[in-house]
Amino acid sequence: LKQGSVLAFIALGLTVVLIAGGFDMSAGAVSQFATNLAAGTMIAGAGSAAALGLGALTGLIAGAVNAALVLIFGMPAFVATLGVMFVAMGATLLYNGGQALTLADQSGFFFIGQGYIGPVPFVLILLLVTTAILHFVLKRTRLGLRMYAVGQDLVAAELRGIGRARYATASFMLGGLVLGLAGVILASYSYGASALATGIDFLISALAAAFLGSTLNKAGELNVIGT
């Protein structure tokens, strides 16, 4: 359950981007970079709050860069996010020097990814809460409904006065936030960060989870609960 929950966070972040008609090849690499930054922050003695904040900021920045490349510079989402993936991979290798970052005893930080509340893994509780929040935002708020509208039929959305730029940017940044937090959780779960930089295994599994999850409703609509 704990290992699956970590992957589910990455899949949730990717699903948010897909809902608005985007695509994010950088999802796994960004999470892996956030994992390394979180591990390095803990090794430096900055504490769990700093690790969480840095992970979230990393994801937000990556989302903003992806949005800028797609919406301002007009690059295809696949190409833009592939470029960000390679940048994140390079940044990870530069940061960790190709070496695993292993944490010593950090009981408070380790609780995020490994702790239990009764018989239930704490990370599973975090996953359920995050899923509920995202479901509410995407299905019960104007922001979320317009993200769906842009993703499902851009022409119809624009005829109704719903511009693509604002809601596609929101999807990249919200998805990036979740991906950054996923990286922090992964650092907690795995006692640090591995020397790997690609995160490609996370990306493939997350894509599979998102698209298979769309089969849970008759419309074949992407949704965080299905993911």
PLM features: residue spans?
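Transmembrane helix-bundle core of multi-pass membrane transporters
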Residues: 73, 77-140, 167-170, 189-198
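Hydrophobic side-chain positions within alpha-helical transmembrane segments
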Residues: 37, 61, 65-69, 181, ...
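Transmembrane alpha-helices
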Residues: 158, 163-187, 200, 204
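Single transmembrane alpha-helix segments in multi-pass membrane proteins
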Residues: 1-47, 68-75, 207-224
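Structural signature of hydrophobic alpha-helical transmembrane segments
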Residues: 1-7, 48-58, 124, 196-206
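Membrane-helix/interface signature in polytopic inner-membrane proteins
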Residues: 133-173
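Transmembrane alpha-helical segments in multi-pass inner-membrane proteins
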Residues: 179, 190-227
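Alpha-helical transmembrane segments within multi-pass membrane transporters and channels
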Residues: 45-85
